[in-house]
Amino acid sequence: MALRHWRAAFEAMEVHMPTFVLLTRLAPDAVRSPQALERLEREAMRRVHAECPDIEWLNNCAVLGPYDYLDIFRAPDVETAAKVATLIRVHGRAQTETWAAVEWDRYKELVRGLPDGVIVATGQE
């Protein structure tokens, strides 16, 4: 009975791979038309999923500022995230920057576990 209870509890746990944020800036001559942009996206995603089948793509956005795109994905480890960034960089003739991220609810859980007196810097001081 105890084993069955433990197994059910384990299966109910939501275990996520690490989350990564990928910022991408395309080379100025990489895309010359909307159709070329769509082809580039399809081919880049095909290559990424073929080489890194374990990733989970969560979201992608066009952004204003020094980068063109912001993508959020989960990968089993930092090496796989680096491979994703490299594939995007090479295939899309792009510059990339990759950040590890902690989802906000999980971050709050982590902070709650800190000892009293620890100052949590949020950049909002």
PLM region descriptions:
Residues 16, 63-65, 90:
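A generic structural micro-feature
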Residues 5-53, 105-125:
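Short S/T/G/P-rich N-terminal loop/turn motif that feeds into the first structured element of a domain
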Residues 67-70, 99-113:
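Short secondary-structure transition/capping segments
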Residues 25, 70-74:
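Short hydrophobic/aromatic beta-strand micro-patches
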Residues 75-105:
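An amphipathic, aromatic/His-enriched active-site/gating alpha helix that lines ligand/cofactor pockets
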Residues 47-70, 99:
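Short, glycine- and small/hydrophobic-rich beta-strand elements in well-ordered beta-sheets
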